[in-house]
Amino acid sequence: MNSIKFPVLDRTTKNSVISTTLNDLSNWSRLSSLWPLLYGTSCCFIEFASLIGSRFDFDRYGLVPRSSPRQADLILTAGTVTMKMAPSLVRLYEQMPEPKYVIAMGACTITGGMFSTDSYSTVRGVDKLIPVDVYLPGCPPKPEAVIDAITKLRKKIAREIYKDRIRPQQGNRCFTTNHKFFVVRSPHTGNYDQELLYPPSSTSEISTETFFKYKSPVSSHELVN
């Protein structure tokens, strides 16, 4: 009867086997292959375009820009977002597969920027529409800052638990406050009060009736006499 013999492990076997968890393997594969969907609407996006060149070379981080949201797991918003563009941004985010991430790049995307001071159509922060993972302030941020934001996102992905990241699809989070308009009477009726437009000088002795009875240009000598 043959006895059971256990195989003898070679010394090099220990160096060939990696013990890890499925969660760590999933995080490692995702952080090394981020496929961004570029949503640029203003000047901040020009700084991100500098990363494509050989000086910064963002391909070394595994970034492959995609034109379809169904093939992307990262959306990078750069520039001003208006109320009219908000539903389109939310729709693009909802079409992305889970897990998905968002980087808000620039002051206009984070807070609305200088365009939100007296504007009724500017969204004051893209986080009112979609959840943001990394905020990148600046006007505009430098390409080095964009690389730092991507590095921070990669560290966040490496620490997260895949089961907790997947969440049910949320409804429309678009900021849809109804605007109330009140009809007021226009002050521009075409009839102007000439006494308010051309008030006579307080030191002049010319009466108002004398000042406005001349419809055609007259000389100052005729006006006084």
UniProtKB/Swiss-Prot annotation:
Subcellular location: Plastid, Chloroplast thylakoid membrane
Keywords for this protein: 4Fe-4S, Chloroplast, Iron, Iron-sulfur, Membrane, Metal-binding, NAD, NADP, Plastid, Plastoquinone, Quinone, Thylakoid, Translocase, Transport
GO molecular function: 4 iron, 4 sulfur cluster binding; iron ion binding; NADH dehydrogenase (ubiquinone) activity; quinone binding
Keyword Lyase: no
Co-factor binding comment: Binds 1 [4Fe-4S] cluster.
SUPFAM superfamilies the record matches: HydA/Nqo6-like (SSF56770)
GO annotations of cellular component type: chloroplast thylakoid membrane; respiratory chain complex I
Listed GO biological process terms: aerobic respiration; electron transport coupled proton transport; photosynthesis, light reaction
Enzyme class: translocase
Membrane topology note: Peripheral membrane protein
One Pfam assignment: Oxidored_q6
Keyword 4Fe-4S: yes
Gene3D superfamilies given in the database record: 3.40.50.12280
Positions of [4Fe-4S] cluster binding: C43, C44, C108, C139
Required co-factors: [4Fe-4S] cluster
PROSITE patterns recorded: COMPLEX1_20K (PS01150)
InterPro entries recorded: NADH_UbQ_OxRdtase-like_20kDa (IPR006137), NADH_UQ_OxRdtase_20Kd_su (IPR006138)
EC number: 7.1.1.-
Reaction equations catalysed: a plastoquinone + NADH + (n+1) H(+)(in) = a plastoquinol + NAD(+) + n H(+)(out); a plastoquinone + NADPH + (n+1) H(+)(in) = a plastoquinol + NADP(+) + n H(+)(out)
Record family assignment: Belongs to the complex I 20 kDa subunit family.
Chain's role: NDH shuttles electrons from NAD(P)H:plastoquinone, via FMN and iron-sulfur (Fe-S) centers, to quinones in the photosynthetic chain and possibly in a chloroplast respiratory chain. The immediate electron acceptor for the enzyme in this species is believed to be plastoquinone. Couples the redox reaction to proton translocation, and thus conserves the redox energy in a proton gradient.
Record text on subunit structure and interactions: NDH is composed of at least 16 different subunits, 5 of which are encoded in the nucleus.
Protein name: NAD(P)H-quinone oxidoreductase subunit K, chloroplastic
Source organism of the structure: Olimarabidopsis pumila
Organism taxonomic ancestry: Eukaryota, Viridiplantae, Streptophyta, Embryophyta, Tracheophyta
